[in-house]
């Protein structure tokens, strides 16, 4: 397992605390494993999942900055134009702003503050933030995830062989041994398709 290289797609939404826990854990694993774990972060807006009307399409909304989900995706997409490391830093910063700071990721000043904190070129970021280029990416990620892979929530981790799992990592008590946990997670999810669902009972609920 230690010598394996894995590439995974991770479906996420910034509003989801479980996706935040997954991001922190996977970053810890990547920090130790380096190129042996490659992660493609895929947009999966929960606002679209929970839409009341069948006609609602998040990616068809106007590019006017009024939707927080789209705005957060525009922000991280703008960061990615400044490099993979810039994306990585901004991705983590947006989760922190949302879940530790309680900030609204639809507010331009919040996004610009995050961009400044992670060292982005602010003028370039401001220009790229206004692009609607990411809208089609959101559509493609969501549609493929839902229709082709059966993704229903975040975070969902999908391996190259198409096997995947929706995983709730306790963001208040992350694994103390992130790589060991990863090495235990992989063979069950990737290599055991007969394991259809694992769900812990919740005493008192």
Please place each PLM-identified region on the residue numbering.
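Conserved short-loop catalytic and cofactor-binding motifs
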Residues: 14, 63, 99, 126-129
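C-terminal cap of thioredoxin/glutaredoxin-like
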Residues: 25-31, 101, 105-205
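Local sequence-structure signature of Cys/Sec-based thiol-disulfide redox active-site neighborhoods
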Residues: 2-28
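Short beta->alpha junction loops/turns
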Residues: 15, 83, 131-134
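Structural alpha/beta surface segment adjacent to cysteine/selenocysteine redox centers
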Residues: 20-111, 184-188, 192, 196-205
């Amino acid at each position: 397992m230690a010598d394996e290289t894995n590439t995974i797609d991770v479906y996420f939404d910034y509003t989801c605390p479980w996706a935040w826990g997954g991001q922190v854990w996977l970053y810890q694993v990547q920090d130790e494993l380096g190129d042996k774990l490659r992660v493609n972060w895929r947009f999966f807006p929960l606002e679209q999942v929970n839409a009341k009307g069948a006609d609602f399409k998040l990616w068809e909304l106007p590019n006017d900055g009024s939707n927080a989900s789209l705005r957060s995706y525009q922000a991280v997409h703008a960061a990615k134009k400044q490099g993979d490391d810039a994306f990585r830093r901004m991705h983590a910063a947006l989760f922190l702003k949302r879940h530790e700071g309680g900030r609204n990721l639809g507010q331009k000043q919040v996004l610009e503050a995050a961009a400044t904190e992670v060292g982005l070129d602010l003028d370039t970021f401001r220009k790229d933030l206004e692009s609607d280029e990411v809208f089609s990416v959101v559509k493609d990620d969501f549609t493929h995830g839902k229709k082709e892979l059966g993704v229903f929530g975040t975070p969902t981790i999908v391996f190259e062989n198409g096997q995947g799992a929706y995983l709730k990592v306790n963001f208040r008590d992350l694994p103390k041994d992130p790589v060991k946990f990863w090495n235990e997670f992989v063979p069950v999810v990737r290599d055991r398709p007969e394991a259809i669902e694992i769900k812990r009972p919740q005493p008192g609920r």
